[in-house]
Amino acid sequence: MIRKLFKTLLIILTLFLMLIGYLSYFGLTTSKFNSFIKDKIKKQNSDLDIDLKKVKLHLDLKNLSIKIKTKNPKIIIKNSEKIELNEISSNILLSSYFQEKFAIKNLLIESKKNEIKNYINFYKNINNSLEIILINQLIKQGKAQINIELNFDDSGKIKNDYKLSGKVLNAEIQVQKNKILKDLNFNFLVNDKNYKFEKILFKFNKINFNSEFLNIKQKNKKFHINGNLKNKKDKINNDIILSIFEDNLEIFDFSNTKFESTSEFNFDLSKKFRIKNLKIDTKLNLDELILKYDSNKIKNYIKNYNNLINLKQNKLHIKYSKEKILIDGSSKFYIDENFDNSINFQIEKIKNKIDFKTLLNLDKIKFSIEDIAYKKIRNQNATLQVKGFKNNKKLLFESIDYKEKNNNIVINNLEINNNKISNVDKIKFDFLSKNNFKNQINLIKKDDNYELVGKSFDSIQLIENISDSESDKNFFEIFENLNSNIKILVDEVKLDEKSTVNNLRAYLDIRNSKIFDLDLNSNFNENEKLFVSIKTQKDNSILTTFHSDRAKPFVKKYKF
């Protein structure tokens, strides 16, 4: 009897072990749970349904759990739209099940590629918020494949270690009115308060862009976002320019311009989609653009200027923040088609103040400054450095330094206000004129007055301008309400090709940018003198006295 009982128990144990082995290795396939699962979903939301195939059960001896898996299920929304899935799987803890606790340990869902609109409609049936309505309006089309990993605690709540991953394919998103991102593709990974996007590709205004990463991290009630954006060399269009710059850029011709860029950015985004603390670091290369600028001032110096400046190999490094904008740039520029020159510049904007530094290489430009008898020939090394700032209506050139071989022109603290000179601290001329005469003079400010001193100066233009105070060409009208005394001490002044005067001494009283008094003395030699006097009378009439022992240098130039 005992032997039979023992034999029976042994058979039962063997069968039980075989059953456990079978369940753990092969599993059990059934469809008995399908109606139960469908009923549970219907009770949660009557607009949702699920199409299940057979469910497979696997026994996990190591974790004392049962793994439930089903292949190719479909979630049906309002009997029409479908979300097709590759697999749904879950683990049920046996110990929790028998203790009547929440037994589901985890839930894994792997979808197929479905229309993004279907995912949105599914979510709307669960939580129809304003944000999801806005997202639905912005997304025009596209597909997505999504993987969901959820872990549950003993009370059935989702743990914070959830994971949402997948990829978006060929999406279209409206970013502005009539502006759409096309062919949008990216991979994504979402977990607790962190959103990561990688391998981002899209097309905007027919230009291909890509991004290696875009990270979003939730902090309290805001999101911190950082990422990068790139594009390979492609042809630019006006829509791109207008979307970046609000100013009128009609003076630029971008018709043949190709560009490439690399940008890194970070900012904070509130729940109301307000951007704060935006910072952008961009490197931008423009192969060619044309500046259309009609300027008579430029033509006064460069005779063959045709209102076009061709800019090539343009490189810009732009750093933007709310507090400051910094631009470093360089270009090759062409005024004559076959002769290139270069420019390097830095611009910094803080509030209403704009600081600038510029270095121009002018080797291959020929130009002249007629008022000071200066002429530069082509292929002669020359540089121009300019440093200053603009603040509201005030424009200050802290330093202007022009160098060409042994020639040098320096201007310090030249202040422009309302298109007129309101101040200048120093002007230095040290160059050989086009008449092969050395110009060596300095204009120096002392308190509110000036001294013009030097060894030599090749021009009578200064005397002509001073003497012409009653005409429309009054030299001092370029100044803003100038009220100063000017003392002039120049050893030698060239009047024309054959005449010079020595020891030119003058004293000027300037009031409201006009000559009030002038006394000028000089000599051709010991016996030949030059004297000019201008006196303003009490009735505001002007008495001018002129004497020269040589008439020839002045007969054609001086207006009696």
Tell where the protein language model's regions lie, with residue ranges.
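Membrane-proximal interfacial segments on either side of biological membranes
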Residues: 2-7, 30-66, 88-560
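Short, cysteine-centered beta-strand-loop-beta hairpins and adjacent loop/turn segments enriched
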Residues: 73-82, 174-176
